[in-house]
Amino acid sequence: MNKNICVCGCNGYLGNALVQRLLKQNYFVVGIDNDVKLEWLDECNSVSALPILSTLEKCRSFRKMGKYAHYNIDISKDINRLREVFKAHNFDTIVNLAQMPSAPYSQIDLEHASYTIQNNSLGTVHIAWLMKEYCPDAHIIEIESMGTYNHAINTEIPEGKFTFERKGRSSEPCIFPRQAGSFYHSAKINSMYFLDCCQRFWGLKSTTINQGVVFGITTPEIEESGIYSHLAYDSTFGTAVNRFIIQTMMDRPMTIYGNGNQKRGYLSLNDSIQCLMLFIENPANDMRIVNQLADVYNINQIIDIIKKIKPESTSINMKSPRAETTDDFYYNVCTDALKSFGFKNTRTIEDEISSIFKIVDPDYLNKEQEKFVQWK
């Protein structure tokens, strides 16, 4: 098994959990993170619902768990320093999680949109070129988003490439059409097409994961170590389930955008890491495009689940600040790749919601009023 792995964005919500899983399974892990996310969070007054360790404290803890090296590098800018890392380590796998993770943040203004596209796209290009130069047989995994699709496209969303027909002629396999929901999602689409170029030009092996909304705070490794990821609950960086739970804990109504019929794919943090491990352990032979989710819910269904667990919770409908359809629509996503590798959902949304209510201390939360970024 290939055991030499680089995790870019190792301090993030997914990266922190993935590093601990890899170390537990005896991988040699090189973590790269320049901690710029702390600046984004501070700018938006986004505090964690849980205490988190500093990077130095994490590094010390990770090195006690296993073989771990850490580099403070901006992969979108510091090409020479990134090159030195690739020279020093013969990577088998690179997992790129080093992207600004918020659609609302990318919509704040021109500067934030421009920054998001540069930060999230150039990192992919730099990694791919350095793989070509120093580890051409390695496998890169990137987390993209189900939000790169038109959610209301009214057909099954496939995996891989597809062929289309027009006037009796069939095309060569193509990437399924995308329709970004934000500038953040546009940058995700860019990264996918860059990896497609690298496969066609150089034979680079890659897995592009279109992931649903992730919720939850624990994995078995986090439960053992107590080293939590940043749990955002503001409207800019907090994801739907996590944000609703914390709103309830602060005795605030859960804010539903529009009529709440927006359907999305969801999976727990633990299942997201399970999926990543499956793709690490089963590298692609060329370019692999997969969808990653466990269940599909609309917002109203999630609200109802939380209200069953906490009957005192309330909700309100507000005009959606986003440019999205809030009407009911057909939503069916193919997830055959995960099934072929034996993926099984390990944590229900009910269990994970109950767990967050038990673990998070309400007195630790920031009670300042939320601010909403307007798309239009």
Kindly give the residue locations of the regions a language model identified.
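Short, conserved glycine- and acidic-residue-centered signature motifs
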Residues: N120, F237, Y331
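Hydrophobic alpha-helix immediately C-terminal to the catalytic Tyr-X-X-X-Lys motif of short-chain
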Residues: N190, F194-C198, F244, I302, ...
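Residue-level signature of the cytosolic catalytic core of signaling kinases
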Residues: Q179, Y233-F237, D295, N345
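N-terminal Rossmann-like NAD(P)+-binding domain of SDR-like oxidoreductases, especially those catalyzing
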Residues: M1-I217
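Glycine/proline-rich active-site loop of Rossmann-fold NAD(P)-dependent oxidoreductases
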Residues: I189, F201-L204, G216-N242, M250-R252, ...
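C-terminal substrate-binding subdomain of Rossmann-fold SDR/epimerase-dehydratase oxidoreductases
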Residues: K24, H126, T248-K376
